[in-house]
UniProtKB/Swiss-Prot annotation:
Gene3D superfamilies: Cupredoxins - blue copper proteins (2.60.40.420). This is Uncharacterized protein HI_0731. It comes from the Bacteria. It comes from Haemophilus influenzae (strain ATCC 51907 / DSM 11121 / KW20 / Rd). SUPFAM superfamilies: Cupredoxins.
Length: 127
């Protein structure tokens, strides 16, 4: 399934998750600041790196995991997800099917409540 996207030019985004300090890309969650803008109907390649194993989730989007570490996933392993366990470099293809609004943006980040409270989240706008 993900093979069909390999030949298309994709926007690439790298997210570095600092589990110890509760940061994404060395920043804390700020609900007034949009961290990622995406267009509805597009597909992006996100590369996730975490300092320690942690769950990662995206609201309002779905994705397939392309690879985890050196392991390239096979076609029979692929499924749409909204959460993935990141224990080393993880590469995902994110599809944005739903639009958000300025009043109701989506969030992305860790799925651990203590880390969310520390600010390990980002704001995602899809238009």
């Amino acid at each position: 399934m993900h093979q069909q996207y390999y030949n298309k030019p994709l926007h690439k985004l790298e997210n570095n998750i600092d589990v110890t300090n509760g940061l994404i890309n060395q920043r804390r969650f700020d609900p007034r600041k949009v961290d990622v803008m995406a267009r509805k109907g597009t597909i992006e390649r996100w590369i996730l790196n975490a300092s320690l194993p942690v769950g990662f989730t995206i609201q309002g989007a779905k994705f397939v995991v392309e690879s985890q570490g050196e392991h390239q996933l096979q076609a029979e392993e692929l499924a749409w997800k909204d959460t993935v366990w990141v224990k080393n470099k993880t590469q995902i293809l994110v599809k944005f099917d739903q639009a958000s609004s300025g009043n109701y943006p989506f969030l992305f980040g860790v799925s651990n409540l203590m880390l969310e409270d520390m600010g390990c989240l980002g704001v995602l706008m899809v238009q």
